[in-house]
């Protein structure tokens, strides 16, 4: 079961967004 967070973690695009959110 892959959670959206994990998938986002793999994607650089989402990674940047996640980084900004933190």
Curated annotation (Swiss-Prot):
Its main location: secreted. The keyword Hydrolase applies. One of its GO terms (cellular component) is extracellular region. Binds 1 zinc ion per subunit. It comes from the Eukaryota. Keywords: Cell adhesion impairing toxin, Complement system impairing toxin, Disulfide bond, Glycoprotein, Hydrolase, Metal-binding, Metalloprotease, Protease, Secreted, Toxin, Zinc. Residues 14-22 form the Peptidase M12B domain. GO terms for molecular function: metal ion binding; metallopeptidase activity; toxin activity. Expressed by the venom gland. GO terms for biological process: proteolysis. It is found in: Secreted. Its EC number is 3.4.24.-. N-glycosylated. Coiled coil: none annotated. Its cofactor is Zn(2+). It is an enzyme of class 3 (hydrolase). Heterotrimer; disulfide-linked. The heterotrimer consists of 1 metalloproteinase chain and 2 lectin chains. Belongs to the venom metalloproteinase (M12B) family. P-III subfamily. P-IIId sub-subfamily. Snake venom metalloproteinase that inhibits the classical complement pathway dose-dependently. It acts by binding to carbohydrates of IgG within the antibody-sensitized sheep erythrocytes (EA) complex, and thus prevents interaction of component C2 with immobilized C4b. Also induces cation-independent hemagglutination that can be prevented by D-galactose pretreatment. Negative results: does not show proteolytic activity on rabbit IgG, human C3 and C4 complement components, fibrinogen, beta-casein, hemoglobin, ferritin, myoglobin, chymotrypsinogen, and melittin. This is Zinc metalloproteinase oxiagin.
């Amino acid at each position: 079961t892959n959670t959206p967070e994990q998938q986002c973690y793999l994607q650089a695009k989402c990674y940047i967004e996640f980084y900004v959110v933190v």
